[in-house]
A protein has these predicted regions:
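Short, small/polar residue-rich loop motifs at catalytic or cofactor-binding pockets
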Residues: 273-277
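Radical SAM enzyme core and accessory elements
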Residues: 1-6, 330-410
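Radical SAM/AdoMet-radical enzyme domain recognition
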Residues: 58-59, 63-72, 81-217
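Canonical Radical SAM [4Fe-4S] cluster-binding loop centered on the CxxxCxxC motif
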Residues: 13-49
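Flexible, acidic/Gly-rich N-terminal and inter-domain linker regions that tether
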Residues: 1-17, 29-33, 406-410
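C-terminal accessory region of radical SAM enzymes
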Residues: 233-263, 293-345
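Local cysteine-cluster metal-coordination motifs and their immediate loop/turn environment
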Residues: 26-36, 290-293, 333-350
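Flexible glycine/acidic-rich beta-alpha junction loops that bind and position SAM and/or redox cofactors
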Residues: 145-150, 212-230, 251-266, 295-304
Length: 410
């Protein structure tokens, strides 16, 4: 039976400590679906704050016991601050070595970038210096028309006719990126307007040489009546293309997973979906957050959830509510009884922002219909794929028996 390419679940299977530096809140783009509603050009992290953050974090070895760490850099667009990032990474390496820290040589520097500055000399020098410890994902949303529908250049002129897409500025850097990180995957975001372009976009990314496409629907309440049906149709058409063209052998799309679409087991399926509360994020002011989605620039209507700062450390009482978070303490009765609940995702920050009160224990369910549509298409995908593989296996066995029976016995 042919091998099926599986999704990469991340370095150390996603079990490393994740610490995020919000180095800037500025970006060249103004993506329409971006959850960072408070981007600005003023809030840039200083070296003094970054150094203090590192000194504090590395002094708390008893508090942070994970065997490995991912040092994550985001914005805005992180590579706008490549000089600061380079200095941070140099200092981290020196201090982890000097302290004989258990994270020394058990770390990654991680970036999610819009790709526009990827080819520049300073970014490339940084990559050469740190390549063996780097994870870089360039966001390209698919075909030109899908990408340029949402990922547009920032402008003071809001007239639709003045919008300028960023596809050409990103796609030119994809060959260089893949030559340096051949197994890297991209992240694709789906909102209501670009549902019709899902199939063509995933296939286009495969054609560009990207083998892993991590794709998800936005968690915000943006969906319209009938979106779920159109979504299901696009995924079924995509499933047909992937299977009929044997793309499943070398490519993967995260929409299709054997693990989703089953009833929940209360004992075994009770983990929180994301790492909010286990991860840590620090901003330009030196404030600490349980996740970047709880910083002010990520929130539409709620106050930021600050759990400490880099001078005084973490206030465990402010972090405590996150320690008891699980699926059952925040989900609705409908979620409990859903027959296809497994794999239905949520974002803890969106739960908080969309809740009727300032709580993290009220799950946002805007993607409910979209998840169910995904499950229906996912069932179609696996049924068709396993049927094809079984037929191929049967044919191989038949040919083997034929060859055996045709041998001349002397």
């Amino acid at each position: 039976m042919e091998e099926i390419k599986n999704l990469d679940y991340g370095w150390r299977n996603g079990m490393a400590k994740n610490i995020t530096f919000i180095v800037t809140k500025d970006c060249q783009l103004a993506c329409k679906y971006c959850y960072l509603v408070g981007k600005n050009t003023q809030e840039r992290m200083s070296w003094e704050v970054a150094k203090q953050a590192i000194d504090y974090l590395l002094s708390q070895e008893q508090l942070f016991r994970e065997e490995a760490v991912v040092w994550d850099f985001i914005g805005g667009e992180p590579f706008l601050e490549i000089e600061l990032i380079d200095r941070i990474c140099d200092y981290l390496k020196i201090e982890m070595y000097r302290k004989n820290h258990h994270w020394f040589n058990a770390y990654r520097f991680s970036f999610s970038t819009n790709g526009i500055n990827y080819h520049t000399e300073k970014v490339q020098n940084f990559i050469k210096k740190n390549h063996s410890h780097l994870s870089i994902g360039i966001t390209i949303d698919g075909t030109r028309r899908k990408h340029d529908l949402n990922r547009i250049w920032k402008t003071s002129d809001t007239a639709p006719l003045k919008e300028k897409g960023s596809y050409d500025d990103v796609v030119k850097n994809i060959p260089l990126w893949l030559s340096q990180f051949p197994s890297a995957g991209t992240k694709v975001t789906i909102s209501s307007a670009d549902i019709p372009y899902i199939k063509e976009s995933v296939l286009h990314l495969y054609e560009l040489g990207i083998q892993e496409v991590n794709i998800n629907c936005v968690f915000e309440d943006v969906w319209k009546e009938g979106d779920d049906k159109l979504f299901e149709k696009q995924l079924i058409d995509l499933a047909d293309a992937i299977i009929d063209e044997d793309l499943y052998r070398e490519h993967v799309c995260s929409f299709f997973s054997e693990a989703i679409g089953k009833p929940l087991d209360r004992e075994n399926d009770n983990r929180n979906w994301c790492g909010a509360g286990n991860m840590l994020s620090v901003d330009a002011a030196g404030n600490l957050y349980p996740c970047t989605r709880f910083a002010l620039y990520s929130l539409r209507s709620k106050k930021p959830w600050i759990i400490g700062n880099v001078w005084d450390g973490i206030d465990q009482n402010k972090l405590r509510p996150f320690l008891t978070l699980d699926r059952w303490t925040q989900s609705t009765e409908q979620c409990f009884g859903c027959e296809v609940a497994s794999g239905c995702a949520w974002c803890q920050g969106e739960n908080y922002d969309a809740a009727a009160t300032p709580t993290i224990y009220q799950r946002a369910t805007a993607i409910c219909k979209m998840h169910k549509a995904r499950v229906r298409a996912n069932n179609y995908y696996w049924n068709k794929l396993f049927h094809k593989l079984q037929v191929e296996q049967d044919m191989e066995e038949l040919e083997r028996q034929k060859r055996k029976s045709n041998k001349v016995i002397c």
